[in-house]
Amino acid sequence: MAKKVQAYVKLQVAAGMANPSPPVGPALGQQGVNIMEFCKAFNAKTESVEKGLPIPVVITVYSDRSFTFVTKTPPAAVLLKKAAGIKSGSGKPNKDKVGKVTSAQVREIAETKAADMTGSDVDAMARSIAGTARSMGLVVED
């Protein structure tokens, strides 16, 4: 018989740096999950990813307090900031431009995020990423 799902916990955790401190500890402790077990499993799964990159994770907690988790790709905004070499986006994206990204970089990010995005093809996903870039105050160059 299938296990009964108790809760879904969605978090963003830095790759390879999961530890019992907030936000991981309180979110999982509330559900009665073994926090260190999750931290070890998450860090092992994300050791190939650049350390410190925020990774969205969805943890499925079952009624017997066991769990499974699925990692996603880093948020588009984080990948765009890394590609443009900036710390943060613009407070006034329509007026103040803070950096530039090439359409090749945008396409590369779209290919990276393809597994998590709902787009019919890479071009559609690239347009979506370009829209995110514009809303951050980045200029997309050809």
Swiss-Prot record:
Pfam families: Ribosomal_L11, Ribosomal_L11_N. The keyword NADP does not apply. One or more lysine residues are methylated. One of its GO terms (molecular function) is large ribosomal subunit rRNA binding. GO terms for biological process: translation. GO terms for cellular component: cytosolic large ribosomal subunit. CDD domains: Ribosomal_L11. Signal peptide: none annotated. Keywords: Methylation, Ribonucleoprotein, Ribosomal protein, RNA-binding, rRNA-binding. The keyword Cell membrane does not apply. InterPro entries: Ribosomal_uL11, Ribosomal_uL11_bac-typ, Ribosomal_uL11_C, Ribosomal_uL11_C_sf, Ribosomal_uL11_CS, Ribosomal_uL11_N, Ribosomal_uL11_N_sf. It comes from the Bacteria. Transmembrane segments: none annotated. Belongs to the universal ribosomal protein uL11 family. Forms part of the ribosomal stalk which helps the ribosome interact with GTP-bound translation factors. NCBIfam families: L11_bact. Part of the ribosomal stalk of the 50S ribosomal subunit. Interacts with L10 and the large rRNA to form the base of the stalk. L10 forms an elongated spine to which L12 dimers bind in a sequential fashion forming a multimeric L10(L12)X complex. This is Large ribosomal subunit protein uL11. The gene is rplK.
